[in-house]
Amino acid sequence: MTGSVTEVGFRWSTSSGNLGNTATGTLNGTPFSASLSGLTAGTTYYYQAYVKVQGTGDKSSTVSTFYGSTNSFTTSSLNTWLSNYEIPATTVASLSESNTLYEGRYCHDSVNETYGNTKACRYNTTDANQKVVTHTYSYNSKVVRNYSFLYDKTYKTALWVAYATSNSGDFKDNDVGRNDAWAYDPALDQSWQQNLSGAYSSSNGLRYDRGHQVASNDRQTTVEQNKQTFYYTNMTPQYSALNQGQWVELEKKVQGVATVTTGSDTLYVVTGPLFEGTLASATDKSGATCPAPSGYWKCLMKCTFSSPGVMSSAVGCAYLFDTNSSNIAPTVTTIDAIESRTGFDFFANVPTSLQTTAESQSYSFF
């Protein structure tokens, strides 16, 4: 068919079999282009170019459309705090450029930190009773991630807490001390949280402490960074003898590894509770009861970088406390074993070639 071109463009969609969206192109010779908007990050799109041609002579009232072959492209993932190496794989609700942008990273929304002049970033998950939060602090004129966690409204507990540490750069140990700045976490509604303005009441003959998941001594870079470890969301009802015994001993050993982790090395830590079997309960300052974990675990991965963003090696190990009612030393195990126990996929952003070996190792760092 001969005639004149009246329109060019693309039809497109996330489904190759249903290209229902149209973007009209600019008719200015060949090739032509069109702009697409409202795309979702990390998504594959399919498209076909089209040309509309109006006939001549006795076909002048006829407009025919010709289509090219189907092609595809994938949009880049949005930069989020969830892309850091310490973060377990967590299914969050979709993000787009219409969501909150903070310091070059996207989240569903953000809120001012109680301590410091930065913001906490909040992510919705596919479970309405769970949210992911990343706390941040300011150091050396930039915003730095402090720690992230997956919080569960039912247990009123973070199911995992993840952070990076070393003795250089953004996490340098400046020995700012313990600030005891107990406070509700500004990133979550207070109804989701335990009231830990004071100690737990004794329950079933067990005395529970407000047990840190990220230890105060793990965060010694700035005062604000340390204070954020006293948010109630970072606490669990932990058997007092365990919290002040084998648990703190493990924390000290982790801090010892962090102290000698400098330069191109970073230690990534994920810790969390177990909720298995019949659970004891603890009573907070408001008289509300909450489940006490049945045990705890801690996973470590020490990574070396040959250049910024290029990881060259990784070693891993894990520690398991099978009980929250005695002061028994942890069992040395593998990250794989903790993944099987909890259902989480740890260190999901570490390259698979390094992650697989590191997660199957069972020797202790100390």
Annotate the PLM regions.
Residues 1-77:
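Short, surface-exposed linear motifs at loops/turns and structural transition points
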